């Protein structure tokens, strides 16, 4: 699956106002944790913006704030000036809460558990609600449960019926972390919990 490509407006531009960064991160997590092969268009991992004409959707990668730094380029011609909300890659690499580090962590989780990408996907409709979306993925005898909270509110859900014991990975867009104990999952706003 892909969330954006070179013919579409960049995803960070979809979200404005309160919680725009958290929504941008959550959208990346939902895309990258879908089953199948994931695709990440360059610049999405740092929240680049670009809409309107094709040239503006294909702005040069923002490696550094220094226009003369190694790897920097200009163009394309006819691109509209676009205000960028988030820092360049070099700065985001140093910030543990940046979009870049969130995307990097999401990809690490995807790679650590093959059932996420390759598994048979089951939407747990009876356990999901307005704030929580739950999927079970099974592959080669392994099972993972992914719980997404894409809302601005904290959410709790009992998943004891799914037969999982431990939280093995989590993604948080704020400093508040998800938790899991005795079948009860508690997720702060805009977070993900992976259980096995």
Tell where the protein language model's regions lie, with residue ranges.
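Loop/helix patches that line or flank the sugar-binding groove of alpha-linked glycan CAZymes
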Residues: 2, 10, 16-155
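Short, glycine- and charge-enriched coil/turn segments that flank and shape catalytic ligand pockets
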Residues: 20-21, 163-166, 181
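Short beta-strand element of the conserved SAM-dependent methyltransferase core
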Residues: 61, 135, 167, 193-195
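A structural detector for beta-sheet-dominated domains
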Residues: 64, 126-128, 160, 171, ...
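Short helix/strand-capping connector loops at secondary-structure junctions
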Residues: 82-84, 173-176
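Beta-strand-rich binding/interaction modules
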Residues: 154-174
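C-terminal beta-strand-rich structural cap/linker in extracellular carbohydrate-active enzymes
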Residues: 180-196
């Amino acid at each position: 699956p892909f969330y954006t490509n070179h013919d579409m407006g960049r995803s960070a531009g979809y979200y404005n106002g309160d919680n725009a960064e958290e929504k941008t991160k959550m959208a990346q997590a939902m895309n990258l944790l879908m089953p199948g092969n994931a695709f990440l268009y360059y610049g999405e991992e740092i929240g680049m913006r670009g809409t309107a004409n094709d040239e503006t959707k294909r702005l040069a990668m923002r490696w550094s704030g220094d226009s003369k730094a190694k790897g920097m380029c200009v163009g394309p011609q006819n691109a509209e000036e676009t205000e960028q909300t988030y820092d360049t890659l070099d700065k985001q690499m140093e910030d543990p809460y940046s979009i870049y580090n969130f995307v990097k962590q999401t990809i690490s989780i995807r790679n650590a558990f093959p059932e996420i990408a390759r598994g048979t996907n089951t939407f747990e409709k009876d356990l999901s609600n307005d704030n929580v979306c739950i999927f079970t993925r099974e592959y080669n005898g392994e099972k993972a449960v992914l719980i997404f909270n894409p809302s601005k509110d904290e959410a709790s859900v009992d998943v004891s019926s799914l037969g999982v014991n431990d939280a093995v990975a989590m993604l948080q867009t704020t400093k508040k972390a998800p938790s899991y104990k005795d079948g009860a999952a508690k997720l702060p706003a805009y977070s993900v919990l992976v259980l096995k």
